[in-house]
Amino acid sequence: MTMNSCADNSTKTNEADAVLENIFNRKSVRSFTSEPVSEEHIETMLKAAMAAPTAVNYQPWRFVVVTDRAQLDAMAEVLPYAKMLRQAPLAIVVCGETTWFDGKENPYWQQDCSAATENLLLAAEALGLGAVWTGVYPNMELAGPLGEFLGLPETVQPLCAIPIGHHDGTTKPRDKWKPENVHYGKW
């Protein structure tokens, strides 16, 4: 084994440790300071979201970035489970194009946009920001009004709204490992 291969293995181990630490430290943060999120951080989170896997590389995700205080407050009225929007300086609404190239229904947009959402949440954690996934779709009592509020085209559905901001660090990650939920070979 050469010195370079040892260094390469060490680097890969350190990178793997950093990735896993970020995953295990991710938490749902519902309380934010008023400090704005930089445009650089917003772009980094969006780039991470768009790096998600996607069926046939269709990339159906669309994002609505909301930083206007009045609009965030109004969104909190539209989404009863997202009252923390009143504190958050930023929300990113993850939406999906529900049709394929040929106009037929895209049955994978929810999966693709969910993967993008998780990447966005992990990027927020890596940047030292707090965020929480607030579900919207498939509840049309939420998706319909939010889509109208945001002026979404007919073929675009809001999957979730992600309030994002700086936090005080009091929210701690939870250990969600439950071996009884794992089955090998068959149920």
Model-derived features: where do they sit?
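Acidic, surface-exposed loops and disordered segments
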Residues: 1-187
